[in-house]
Amino acid sequence: GVVAAKLLLKNFFDTDLLIQNREGQRLQQIIDEKGLDYFARAEEEAVLSLDIAGTVIATGGSVVYSPAAMEHLRRMGKVIYLHLEYETMCRRIQNLDSRGVVLQAGYTLQDMYKERLPLYRRYADAVIKCDNNTVEQTAQQIARCAR
């Protein structure tokens, strides 16, 4: 995200950081102490509070569960889905228990992946396959899509 913003000469904004700042807690603490429903509302409110067109915005993956948030993002600009195959996602996710991943009780990562995939595709204006990309390659593809 930040590398793409630099290529595009745009600002960069991370909604996870906004949520943490508003709540005064790390994402995982919010989920553990206040629950998934509370976190979902906080995430939706954070996204709906944004009025920053012309900015590269990185969201958490669970924002896709909020139609209102996704439509708001689409009104501000292009929604670009950075696609990873399931196996690649598993390799890249570190510290699952502490990184603030919204995972419903009883769900596996594969359940989450299968549930979110059609939602990501529904809201995406563009899809970039990132499995074999470096950060720089992905940023260049984001920049091409965003222009």
List where the protein language model places each region:
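A conserved segment at the C-terminal end of the G1
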Residues: 1-10
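Short amphipathic alpha-helical segments
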Residues: 2, 68-71, 91-95, 140-141
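NTP-dependent small-molecule kinase module
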Residues: 7, 91, 117-147
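ATP-dependent small-molecule kinase phosphotransfer cores
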Residues: 15-63, 67-71
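Structured helix-beta-strand junction loops
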Residues: 33-34, 53-54, 75-76, 96, ...
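Short, well-ordered beta-strand core segments
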Residues: 55, 79-80, 126-128
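Short glycine-rich anion-binding loops that position phosphate/pyrophosphate groups of nucleotides
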Residues: 61-63, 85-87, 133
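A glycine- and Lys/Arg-enriched "phosphate-lid" helix/loop adjacent to the NTP-binding pocket
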Residues: 76-118
